[in-house]
Amino acid sequence: MNVLRTQKYWVNQFAINFACRNTYVNPMFLRYFHCAVPRAISQRALKPMDIPFLQCYIEPIDNTSFFLHPFKKIRFWWRYLFYGWWNLKKNQFLIKRTFPDRDFSIAEIIQNALKLHSGVNKALANHDLQQLEELCTLRTAQILKQQALNQPKCIWKLEKHISKPKLLNLSRAQADLKGEEFFVQAVVRLHTLQSLRTDKGSPKIEKPDIENVVIQQRSWTSPIRWQLWGSVPSTPVNTVRKTLPDGQVTFVAKPSKKSFLKQLFSGKE
C-alpha cells in the first residue's frame, strides 16, 4: 500500500473518532443479559448491557477573543461554569455518595480513558478481536470488530499529547427499578498526535486529532471496569438549551436569521 493510499485509508477507515462517532444507540434498542432460567422462576430483573450516550453539555473549543466579541465570550464562560464545571462537580459528588468505595477522581478517570484509547486503537490496528471485546462496550465492540475484518493490519502509535487531557463530564443512569445499579459515563477530551503505517518499513502518516472520548462502566458487573463507549462531538457554540418532555436537558442548533426569515415569509410553521 503506497503512502497516498495509506493516507486515504487513514482518513476513511481508521481511528475510534471515525469508527465510533455514529455509535449512538437508538433509545428503543437495549441489549439484555441472557438468563439461564425463566424470569418467572428466578424473579431477577433483566438489566441492559448498553445504553445510548447520556446527553450533556460538551464544552466546545472556543477561540473567540474577549476584546473582539465580549458578549460571546462571557456567554461561553457562563455556559462552561453552569453546564460544564458545576454539572461535573455535582455529578461527581452524587456518584461518590452512591459508591463510596470506588475511585471516581478526575486523575483516575483520565488515566482509564488514556489506557482505553491506546488499547482499542492498537487492538483495532492489530485485528485483536478478543481485546476489542474486553475493552469496548457491546455495541462499540461489534462495530469495531466488523471494521477490523474489512481493513488490513497496520501499526498505530500515539506520538504525543498536544494538550493536557481534560474531564468534561461525568453522568450516571439508573439500570434497575430499585435504583441500586447504575451506568456511569465519563467524557474525556484528548488532543493528540497519532501516526499510522502499514508496516515497520513504510513511511508513517501523522495526524493531529481532538476526540471527546466516552468511557462507561456498569456497577453490577465483576470486576468493575471502564470500557470504551465511543466518541461524541462537542456542543456547538450557536446552540440553545432545551428541556425535553422527560425532563432531560439538551442543546439544539439555533436557527440562523436567514432560515428564520425564510420560514416566516413562506408561511410554514
UniProtKB/Swiss-Prot annotation:
Pfam families found in the cross-reference section? MBA1
* Disulphide bond pairs: none
Under InterPro entries, the record lists:
Mba1
Q: Which GO terms describe its cellular component?
A: cytosol; mitochondrial inner membrane; nucleus
Output one GO MF annotation.
ribosome binding
Gene3D superfamilies from the xrefs?
3.10.450.240
Superkingdom of the organism of origin = Eukaryota
GO biological process annotation, one example: protein insertion into mitochondrial inner membrane from matrix
User: How is this protein named in the record?
Assistant: Uncharacterized protein C13G7.11
Organism whose genome encodes this protein: Schizosaccharomyces pombe (strain 972 / ATCC 24843)
